[in-house]
């Protein structure tokens, strides 16, 4: 199954994040703090600060929450001092918040993944759900601790025990992968993604839709796949459009040529949606369609434009295709230096045919041009149109049951 981003990692979840996944009455925090924490989660930091200051002297957890409020309000030094004091006093909330500061390099503290993992574990051992989720995420990433799917799953199981959609999704990610001695469990992963998606987690909707479309871990259901993928696309996950395009493109041809042509055209339309949203694989597939005249009128100039956008994002297949177009002048433009630059980059990205193309035409390109192209390739830095990593998604209202 293709990745939703070129690089996909689970996002660390802040203690204040995902307000829609938190109890409306803040019943996940000690009773004396609930009204203050509710105000904080609703964005009323002034009310939260007043209430927490009155509790700070007698509660380390209040110190931790007050520290978070103060950092949000710009009083970074005092906020950090209070969070550190809470952690030193053994507050799980304080340990978790200090861990997040180390994990993200915030509040003037240099990033320290190892220290973050230690603090997350202290809080997780005390039953702090967000700490369990974040510790599991670090084990899944191999960030601050050796990568260990067994440990990741163990902590994420604890975090997901109450049905938190972020934890369900993260556990689904961990169940999707294998690393000896842990084996993948696609059926469990699909169920976890479904449960998270039903609670409005749109990256889960994307992955669940892809599994439905491919019949991985669950019975193949193209109609249901399109439902979830379209929902993800409508709610800020542009890879949903790419996945729908792939789903339509894989649909077996029938004897009805008109229906086949319409199916192909629909697939290209979805690739265009993904391409315009910045998905590099969507840009590459749209370029292929324009170059071949498949589902659209043939237009090499448009093909070169879309290959260029995907190549600039570092997609080796697009870099290879763009290099060939610039060598052959397919779109009316020949530029051996740029062509070789993109072929060098495609080879560096692992494309198996890039070197063979260069070797085939190398004697036709002056040595100075090849050296210039190599220097340009060395200096190249991709420009991404989308985040390279998953970011914490906004939960949407749970979709209606199907």
Give the label of every model feature segment.
Residues 63-72, 97-104, 109, 134-141, ...:
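Hydrophobic face of amphipathic alpha-helices that form TPR/SEL1-like repeat modules
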Residues 27-28, 57-60, 89-91, 105-106, ...:
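Short helix-capping/linker turns of helical repeat alpha-solenoids
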Residues 43-47, 73-82, 109-119, 146-155, ...:
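Structural signature of tandem alpha-helical TPR/SEL1-like repeats
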Residues 353-402:
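Terminal, low-structured helical/coil segments at or just beyond the last alpha-helical repeat
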Residues 12, 19-68, 72-74, 386-402:
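N-terminal leader/linker segments that initiate helical-solenoid repeat arrays
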Residues 7-15:
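Bacterial N-terminal signal peptides
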């Amino acid at each position: 199954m293709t990745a939703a981003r070129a690089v996909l990692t689970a996002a660390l979840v802040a203690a204040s994040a995902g307000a829609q996944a938190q109890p409306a009455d803040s019943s996940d925090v000690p009773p004396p703090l609930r009204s203050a924490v509710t105000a904080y989660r609703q964005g009323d930091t002034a009310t939260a600060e007043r209430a927490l200051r009155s509790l700070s002297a007698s509660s380390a957890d209040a110190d931790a929450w007050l520290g978070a409020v103060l950092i949000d309000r710009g009083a970074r030094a005092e906020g950090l001092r209070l969070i550190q004091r809470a952690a030193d006093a053994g507050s799980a909330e304080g340990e978790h918040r200090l861990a997040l500061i180390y994990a993200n390099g915030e509040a003037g503290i240099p990033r320290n993944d190892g220290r973050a993992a230690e603090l997350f574990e202290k809080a997780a051992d005390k039953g702090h759900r967000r700490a369990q989720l974040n510790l599991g995420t670090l084990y899944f990433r191999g960030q601050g601790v050796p990568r260990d799917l067994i440990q990741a799953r163990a902590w994420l199981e604890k975090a997901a025990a109450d049905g938190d959609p972020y934890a369900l999704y993260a556990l689904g990610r961990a169940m999707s992968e294998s690393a000896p001695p842990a084996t993948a469990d696609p059926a469990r992963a699909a169920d976890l993604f479904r449960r998270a998606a039903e609670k409005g987690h749109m990256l889960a909707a994307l992955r669940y839709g892809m599994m439905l479309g491919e019949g991985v871990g669950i019975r193949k259901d193209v109609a249901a796949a399109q439902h979830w993928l379209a929902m993800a696309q409508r709610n800020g996950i542009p890879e949903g459009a790419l996945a729908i395009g792939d789903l339509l493109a894989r649909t077996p041809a029938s004897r009805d040529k008109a229906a086949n042509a319409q199916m192909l055209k629909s697939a290209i339309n979805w690739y265009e949606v993904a391409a315009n949203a910045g998905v590099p694989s969507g840009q590459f597939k749209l370029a292929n369609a324009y170059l071949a005249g498949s589902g659209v009128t043939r237009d090499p100039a448009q093909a070169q434009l879309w290959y260029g956008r995907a190549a600039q994002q570092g997609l080796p297949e697009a870099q290879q295709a763009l290099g060939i177009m610039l060598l052959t002048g397919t779109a009316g433009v020949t530029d051996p230096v740029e062509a070789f630059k993109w072929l060098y980059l495609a080879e560096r990205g692992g494309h198996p045919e890039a070197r063979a193309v260069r070797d085939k035409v190398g004697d036709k390109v002056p040595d100075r041009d090849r050296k210039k192209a190599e220097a340009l390739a060395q200096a190249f830095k991709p420009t991404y149109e989308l985040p390279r990593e998953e970011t914490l998604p906004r939960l949407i209202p749970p979709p209606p049951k199907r």
